[in-house]
Amino acid sequence: MAQAKDPIKLKVGMVAAVDMLALPIAVERGFFEKYGLDVTIARPYATGVDALNALQAGETDMVQAGVPAIGAILRGMDLVFFGNFSGNATKLGSDATLALIAGKDSGIVKGDLKSLKGKKVATSFGTINHLYLLGLLEKAGLTPSDVTLVNTPPPEMNVALLAKGVDAFACWDPVPVIAMKDVPGAIEVIRGGDVISYLGFNIALRPWVEKNGATIEKFLAAVSEADQWMRKNPKQAAAIGTRWIPGLKLDVAETAMQYNIQQVDRRISAHNYRALWKAQDTLQRLGVIKSVFDVNKHIEPKFILGVMKTYPDLFSDLQPIPADVAIEPGFVFKP
């Protein structure tokens, strides 16, 4: 038998969020090994901003991040998005892993977004939490100036709510699930709602992507297999999460995993281009960013399209991508 080549070493950055868990699952279940990779996960970062800073500093080869990559590209980082860790290739809106939580005496009413007016709301600037909150305000007919936004890292949001430093927060899981268990009288004002399209990409710097196509395909096959395992085994997946996300308790992980598996889809379709375009459009309209970039220059779908063709079984439990949004290599998105 031919000797197996030494596995290819990879360092991948993740954020302490339940929707990132395909990475540790692929490590623990041996999927990376199966495809010839030796993957080290760089510590869970608080947000994608921190993960991208680590990528820029050369601490990692690739990261999983979303909205913060928009700001990074506009500041001159040449990033390429080549897969989705969370989002949806079959429909436009997907934000099931996000929620807005209010404190019990805040005067904010469950289901009534207009009651946010005049309140202090915690979010993490430049992340999907921020984009989601902006989307909620827009849905309520409010503007960002109708509330006081407080820039807060996710690990500190529940403390801020308990101490009444803020009236509410918008965040990704597990933070909202923890609030509902640990903050007396906490109110889930809204969860998800298809208010925005989730942005969660596998990202690396362009020179690295140009040199490592075969490695990227191996990586995407391994995490796609981890995704499918997670969709089929949410309870076991939640248990793995407790070993990787600091302070994550099993009951919280299991609840969060039920939301997470609703949008675990590594595939790329025209919807994912639109999601990135729409996020920029919203952020620019509301003055968060000054300029925008062409999404076609920063999404490279050929690697995941190759994996979809070679390993169709890894996606067989997902809804098929509608023909009108299915793409081929060389696809150009036009808004």
Q: Residue spans of the language-model regions?
A:
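Short linear loop/turn motifs
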Residues: T40, T47-G48, T255-I261, D294-L305
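Short, glycine-/small- and polar/acidic-enriched structural segments
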Residues: A2-T143, T148-N151, N158, D167, ...
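Secondary-structure end/capping motifs
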Residues: N212-D294
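Soluble non-cytosolic domains of exported or imported proteins
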Residues: A17, Y45-V49, T123, T127-I128, ...
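Solvent-exposed, polar/charged alpha-helical surfaces in well-ordered, non-transmembrane soluble domains
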Residues: L21, R29-G30, V49, N53, ...
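Conserved C-terminal helix/tail region of periplasmic/extracytoplasmic solute-binding proteins
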Residues: Q284-P335
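Short amphipathic alpha-helical segments at helix boundaries and their inter-helical linkers
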Residues: E59-V63, L162-A163, N260-Y273, G306-L314
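Pocket-lining segment of extracytoplasmic ligand-binding domains
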Residues: P68, K104, P155-G247
